[in-house]
Amino acid sequence: MALLDIQNLSMAFGGLKALDRLHLAVEAGEIISVIGPNGAGKTTLFNVISGLYRPTEGRLVFKGEDLGRLPAYAITARGIARTFQNIRVFPNLTVLENVMVGMHCRLRTGVPGAFFHPPSQRREEAALRVKARELLSLFGDRLLPAAEENAVNLSYANRRRLEIARALASDPQLLLLDEPTAGMNPRETAESIAQIRQIRDRGLTVLIIEHKLSVVMTISDRVTVLDYGVKIAEGLPGDVANDPKVIEAYLGRKAQLS
C-alpha cells in the first residue's frame, strides 16, 4: 500500500479547475518531484495535501486514512509537514525557537503547564531544546552555530534550511518541500540536494516542487508532471525529460529538457 494515495483528486475555484482528476501514489522512502509550467497546479496540490484547501472531489489517503476533510493541524499530527515557496520563518525568534515552534503538535504539556511551569513542563522543554539542536545539526555548520541568534540574521539560503528543520520538528513521515533550492547559487543548491537525501535516508518520504530541472534530474526517484491541473507524464527522470508532452508543455516546440 502506498504511503500517500491520491485518487481522482480535483480542486476547483469557481469555474477554474486547478487540479483535474489527479491520481498519484507515493511509496514510502521515495523522493518524488512534481514539476510543470507556472499555473500547472503544483502548489495547489501541496495546499490540498497539507489541509489548507479542501478538495472539490476525490480522496487523499495517507497510511490508509482519508485525510480529505481534516484541518491542517490534524494532518500535521498525522505525519505530514511542509515548507512554503515564500519563506515563513519567525524573524524575531531565535533559530532554535523557530524549530521548537514546529514541535507544538507533539507537546504533552497542556495550557495549565504553559502558565505554571511544573517540573514536567520544564523537562519537556529541555528535551525539545536537545531535539531542536539535533535537527539543526543535520545542516552541518549552517544553522547550529547560529542557534541563539534571531532568524532575521540568517542568509536567504539558511532561512530556507531553517524552514526544513522546523518542518522536521513535527516528526513527519511525509515531507513536502516547495522549491527548496529557490534563490540558491550552485554550491548552495548542491549542498541542499545532499541534505534532502540525508533526510530521506533517515526514513522520510519527500515530495518536492522544484523549478530547477537540474535538481529534479539529480534528486528524484520519480517525476510527476502537471499541466493545467492534469497529470501529463510520470516516470523516471530521464524518461520524463524526453517525453514529447512534457517538452510541449514547457517549451511549446520540439526540444529536449536538461
Predicted regions and their residues:
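Glycine-rich phosphate-binding loops of nucleotide-dependent enzymes
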Residues: 1-258
